[in-house]
Every structure is written in C-alpha cells, then in structure tokens.
Regions:
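Sec-dependent signal peptide recognition
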Residues: 2-9
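Mobile amphipathic helical/loop "lid" adjacent to a hydrophobic cofactor/ligand pocket
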Residues: 121, 135-136
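Short glycine/threonine-rich turn/loop motifs
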Residues: 20-127, 191-294, 300-302, 327-345
Length: 345
C-alpha cells in the first residue's frame, strides 16, 4: 500500500513537471524576455554622452513655453513612466485627450502613441514639445533655449561631435530617444521564467499565464513587450460605453483617414502594467481586476470567473521588472538670453 502511495505521488509530481514544461514551451513561442543590454536604435547609436544629454532634456521644464512642464511631468519615471491622472494636464491647465503611455520599454514598441502616429521615439519626442495642449513650444524656441546655456551647448558638442551646429531640434529628439532607449525593465519574474527558472512564477501566476494564452489575450498582447505591435478596434465583440471609448476620439482614423481604422488603437504593452493605473486610453479604469474583466468581455466575448480574473491579474503582476536607477540631473543655469516663460495660449 505504501509503495502504491509513493508511486501515485511520483506520477503526480511527474505530471506536474510535464505540465510545467509544456506551459514554458508554449509561453516561449509567444513571448520573449527583455534583454539586459540596452537595445540598438535605428540610425541613432546610443552613447553615454547622448543618453546623458537626453536625460537632462527629459527632465528640463524650461523646454516648455510655460517653463513648468517637462517630459517627466506626464511620463513620471517614479510612477511607472506615467502620471497619476486619467489624462495629462498640459499648457494652461488644458487636459489631454488620452492617457499618457508609459515611457518604460517604449523602445520595443512598433510605433509610438495610442494611434501609432510616430514611427519611433525620435519622432515621438518632437510631438509633445510642440503640442499646444502639452508643452506648447516650437523648434525655434527649443533650440534658442538650449543655445542660451553654455552647459547645454557643451553637452551637445560631446554628444554630436561631427555635427555643425550641434544644437538642432533633430539632435534634441535624438538625445531624448537615446535616453529613452535605456529605460528598459528586465528581470521581471516572467522574464526569469522565460529564461528557464520554473520557480519564478507561483502556481497562481502560472494558471494566469495559461489562461492568458488559452482565452486569447496573447493574440494581441504578445512578443517582447507583451503588446505594442499591432492595432485593433477597442470593442471587437462588444463596444464599450462612451466613458471608456469617447465617441470624439476615433483613434488611428486621425492618422490614416480610413474608415476601417475608426476606434482602432495600438495594443497597449503590458510590461509593468501593475504600476501604472488608471488603464485604457481614456484612463477611466483604476484596477487591473476591472480592466481584465472589461477586456475579456469587449475584446474576447468571454465572461471570466472570479478565480480566472484573479489568476490573470496575478500573472500580470509578474510582468513588473527591475526599474533603472535614475538620478535627477543638475541642469545648466539659465542666462539673460534664455527665453522667459510664456503662459499665453
């Protein structure tokens, strides 16, 4: 009898190991771990000098017309690369139309912004600084501000030694792109799991991973960034209410002017998703549990049980990686030539 009990235990343990191996194999076919090395950026080699300059620019509010809004205002590196409100507040207390996307791991996205209107981080960096509802500056104002401070001029010369002049709006964007390329978050429990550590996820997280794949979540949220690669309508099966999907915001339609792109958005990357509530482009959902329930119904037509929802949320918590250590930079001192703040619209 004792031998039979031991045999049963061994069979169960063996079955559990096989199930774990099958799950890991299936996951590796869909997802990739974030590399520990800084990724290469097309047509913009990332150097220490360029990334350091980009960090200064990222944190400098004087590049906005008001002198009080920086990139970090809306993409706060201390709060998951996003701000705390449903949508960002910009120049003259104007409210943005959409939730600020996270800057962490954005280098791995196929395109930038919810509607994918920027093909890369360089193009993205040029957008908010000029947007009237965000930083409300102009390329001339940006370069005039930078040229007015010798500390910046010297940094641009170091970062772009072959360019004359070194301070240009294009180089401003390249430096920010280089810095943002360093904002990756490797070594999440899920990364460790994909790299072969079966114990990196607990049983509930593994159950959530299996559900995430079996229910169809991974059809959109796949790859290295677990999203950020494709475009889909918000409301494939059932259209959300107007609180979640405001009728005035037609998503990618504004970029392509194609009726097939109405209410189509870039799939949100899910890395560090537990760190950056509220959720969706409208920023109206404050818990992962509610977000998972909504997505399962409107995108997949599935009604999750309480346990299924909790298991998927547990898996999503395993996507939080190691945040880079960021020291707040000391910025160059303004001079009498530095343009004064302008609060007018």
């Amino acid at each position: 009898m004792r031998k039979m009990s031991i045999a049963i235990v061994l069979v169960l343990v063996s079955s559990h190991a096989i199930a774990n191996d099958d799950l890991m194999t299936a996951a590796r076919q869909v997802f990739k771990p974030i590399p520990s090395a800084i990724p290469a950026v097309k047509d913009n080699p990332v150097t220490v000098e360029k990334a350091e300059l980009g960090k200064m620019l990222f944190f400098d509010p004087r590049l906005s017309a008001s002198g009080i809004i920086s990139c970090n205002t809306c993409h706060n590196l201390g709060t998951g690369g996003v701000d705390a409100g449903p949508t960002s507040v910009g120049h003259g207390w104007q409210k943005g139309a959409r939730r600020a996307p996270t800057v962490y791991n954005s280098v791995f996205n196929a395109a930038q912004f919810w509607d994918g209107r920027a093909p890369d981080l360089k193009a993205q960096a040029k957008g908010p600084v000029q947007a009237s509802a965000e930083m409300n500056a102009t390329p001339d104002r940006v370069t005039s501000t930078l040229n007015s401070m010798e500390g910046y001029v010297g940094k641009f010369k170091q970062a772009f030694p072959n360019d004359t002049p070194p301070v240009t709006f294009d180089n401003f964007a390249k430096a920010i792109e280089a810095f943002e390329a360093t904002l990756t978050t490797p070594a999440a429990p899920f990364d460790q799991y994909l790299n072969g550590d079966v114990s990196a996820l607990d049983d509930q997280q593994k159950a959530g991973l299996k559900l995430f794949m079996d229910k169809g979540c991974a059809s959109c949220h796949y790859g290295l960034n677990i999203g950020g690669q494709d475009y889909f309508p918000f409301g494939v099966v059932e259209k959300p209410d107007t609180k979640l999907l405001p009728t005035a915001d037609k998503g990618r339609f504004a970029v392509t002017n194609s009726s097939s792109d109405e209410y189509v958005f870039r799939v949100a990357p899910l890395r560090n998703v537990a760190l950056r509530a509220p959720y969706f482009h409208s920023g109206q959902v404050w818990t992962l549990k509610e977000a998972v329930g909504i997505m399962s119904e409107v995108q997949l037509g599935a009604k999750l049980s309480e346990k299924e929802n909790n298991d998927i949320v547990a898996f999503l918590n395993s996507l939080s990686g190691r945040l880079p250590k960021i020291d707040y930079p000391i910025l160059p001192t303004r001079t009498k030539e530095t343009p004064p703040p302008s609060l007018s619209k």
